[in-house]
């Protein structure tokens, strides 16, 4: 699209450092967004705003402006070189779609562009800004959410299915909510606090999922915040089962144990998920369902586990049984240098005796 003289002048102005005394001029001429002046890094074609620390490339900025029905910025970013087909992805109303078509967009949304933008934002080592931006662009955007979820569904569905045994729960989640949960899982695993806080604030109706994710990813302090401060509740033994889905989840397993969850059920769950470190941790905490656990191991052909459970060498670790309250700081310090007493006993055992 050939830029107008007005958009060219704005582009020149956006490249300059403008004193705060003249911000009112920028606001009046349309170079104002998210309560701040729009500045342009022409070398990398990035829109710079305080709300987006990483900057926005023109296509991403166009998508956000389209999602917000900001006609002025849609035209401006397109004249500055953004691909209007990206804008069409986020056009949720007929007038905005008409504008995108007038500016040269194809009449069908390009699915490849949706996936390109999603993986550009959500990837290993991503930032809070990118996750928040992804949620702004694609949440409450039914077609885009549908396209993304169909592309990554095999990955995310099986991750969630492992956490929630009731498949009806999964079948009732909308594509948009599944996308939100996926983004939250990424943020939680990478400890992206700003993105985590954003999700807590804007998606409270999914709070049970935030509890599930905190249990699964061994996020003790998030779990405590959700359970104690936000008062999010679910069955205690189900919480323990979820904590046992990933190995070495000692912090969240212990938290559930202190709250009163059945440690023998945790022992059985650890075998079901084939998590041996969790199994020995449960034995350290006093689990003694050896016959049931051994039967399950044999049923699943886990013969090494069955052999381990048949040995009469195990006993609770009294040093782990001192806490009486679910204080995350005390739990963290108690387990900071944890090594399994019973796993050591197993490895030191001489089978020839």
Curated annotation (Swiss-Prot):
Topology class, membrane: Multi-pass membrane protein
Keywords, in A-Z order: ANK repeat, Glycoprotein, Host membrane, Membrane, Transmembrane, Transmembrane helix
Keyword hit for Plastid: no
UniProt key word Secreted: no
PROSITE patterns assigned: ANK_REP_REGION, ANK_REPEAT
Gene Ontology cellular-component annotations: host cell membrane; membrane
ANK repeats: 57-89
Signal peptide range: none
SUPFAM superfamilies tied to this protein: Ankyrin repeat (SSF48403)
Biological role: Plays a role in virus cell tropism, and may be required for efficient virus replication in macrophages.
Recorded family membership: Belongs to the asfivirus MGF 360 family.
Protein's name in the database: Protein MGF 360-10L
The species this protein was found in: African swine fever virus (isolate Warthog/Namibia/Wart80/1980)
Classification of source organism: Viruses, Varidnaviria, Bamfordvirae, Nucleocytoviricota, Pokkesviricetes
């Amino acid at each position: 699209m050939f830029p107008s003289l007005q958009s060219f002048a704005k582009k020149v102005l956006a490249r300059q450092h403008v004193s705060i005394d003249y911000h009112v001029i920028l606001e009046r001429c349309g170079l104002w967004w998210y309560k701040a002046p729009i500045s342009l890094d022409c070398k990398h074609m990035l829109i710079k705003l305080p709300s987006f620390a990483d900057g926005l490339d023109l296509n991403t900025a166009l998508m956000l402006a389209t999602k917000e029905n900001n006609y002025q910025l849609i035209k401006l970013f397109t004249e500055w070189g953004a691909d209007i087909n990206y804008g069409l992805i986020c056009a949720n109303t007929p007038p905005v779609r008409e504008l995108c078509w007038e500016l040269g967009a194809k009449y069908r949304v390009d699915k490849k562009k949706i996936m390109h933008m999603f993986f550009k934002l959500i990837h290993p080592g991503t930032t809070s800004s990118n996750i928040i931006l992804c949620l702004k662009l694609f949440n409450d955007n039914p077609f885009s959410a549908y396209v993304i979820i169909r592309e990554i569904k095999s990955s995310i569905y099986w991750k969630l299915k492992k956490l929630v045994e009731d498949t009806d729960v999964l079948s009732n989640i909308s594509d948009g909510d599944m996308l939100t949960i996926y983004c939250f899982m990424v943020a939680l695993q990478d400890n992206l606090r700003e993105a985590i806080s954003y999700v807590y604030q804007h998606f409270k109706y999914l709070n049970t999922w935030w509890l599930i994710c905190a249990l699964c990813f061994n996020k003790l302090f998030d779990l405590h915040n959700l359970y104690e401060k936000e008062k999010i509740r679910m069955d205690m033994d189900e919480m323990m089962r979820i904590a046992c889905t990933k190995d070495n989840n000692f912090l969240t397993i212990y938290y559930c144990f202190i709250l009163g969850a059945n440690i023998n059920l945790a022992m059985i769950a650890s075998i079901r998920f084939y998590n041996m470190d969790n199994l020995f941790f449960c034995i350290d905490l006093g689990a003694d369902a050896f016959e049931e656990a051994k039967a399950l191991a044999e049923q699943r052909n886990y013969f090494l586990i069955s052999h381990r459970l048949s040995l009469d060498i195990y006993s609770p670790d009294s040093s782990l049984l001192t806490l009486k309250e679910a204080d995350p700081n005390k739990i963290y310090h108690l387990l900071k240098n944890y090594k399994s007493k019973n796993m050591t006993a197993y490895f030191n055992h001489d089978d020839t005796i």
